Amino acid sequence: LGAATGEASVLSAEQRQRWITEAARLNTQVYRERVLADPRYGREHHERGPRKLGSRLALFDCLSCDKCIPVCPNDANFTLVVPQLELPMSTVTPSPGGFVVERRGVLRVDERHQIAHFADACNDCGNCEVFCPEDGGPQLEKPRFFGSLEALRADPHGRGFFVERAGQAVVVVARMGGRELRLHTEGARARFEGERFSLRFDWRDPEGTIEGEAQGPVDLGEAHILHTLGAAVLAPREVNPVSSSDANARQEASP
């Protein structure tokens, strides 16, 4: 700009902008030629997707590699701490004398480090599914949390969870298998409701304290899943989209 010749040169704002635009155009041509010549950017280098292991994702536990978290453009995937535990899977059926309990085994949670998904932030790009070493897609198979009950009910995938506080209680609403379930927990007391049942029990002995009404068998294992996820996502040290929304709501409600 005249410095090389020792001449003073002052550009007007318009001249400076034209100079920047032209420099960017010329630089882009250089970048283009370099990219086309670099095999790292060629089709042959990217025809194969990331390696898959052949295993399938489930609601709990996975490789815990966390690859799905940084590859999401919207930060929709996050981690949760869930205690290692065995969730009892049982079915309760109404009978003239109360309820008959059929135990089906347990659902093991082996890893404290769990992956979860905030569906409100997801644009269904599938990028996390591409990079996940397991099949199924974290955005679909992992616990899908929603920021409102309306968003949960409107979701086309038909599965997920909405968690909120109601006074001292924690309420978890879930859509599972095309059904809407609601679990209300306050202290040790729980109320588990669905389209054809309304049960009450104590978490210290769920199977032994069941009372209420049901028009058929009820999967009590689903209540354990809702309870575990609700407690985990709102745990005091957890910082995630659900706990943040809960903290904001409590702050707005405080005098």
What are these regions (language model features)?
Residues 1-55, 125, 166-255:
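Iron-sulfur (Fe-S) cluster-binding modules
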Residues 81-93, 104-116, 129, 133-167:
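Catalytic or ion-translocation cores adjacent to nucleophile or general acid/base/metal-coordination motifs
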Residues 1-121:
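Ferredoxin-type iron-sulfur electron-transfer modules and their immediate structural context
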Residues 65-71, 75, 125-138:
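Cys/His-rich metal-chelating microdomains
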Residues 41, 60, 78, 99, ...:
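Phenylalanine-focused residue identity feature
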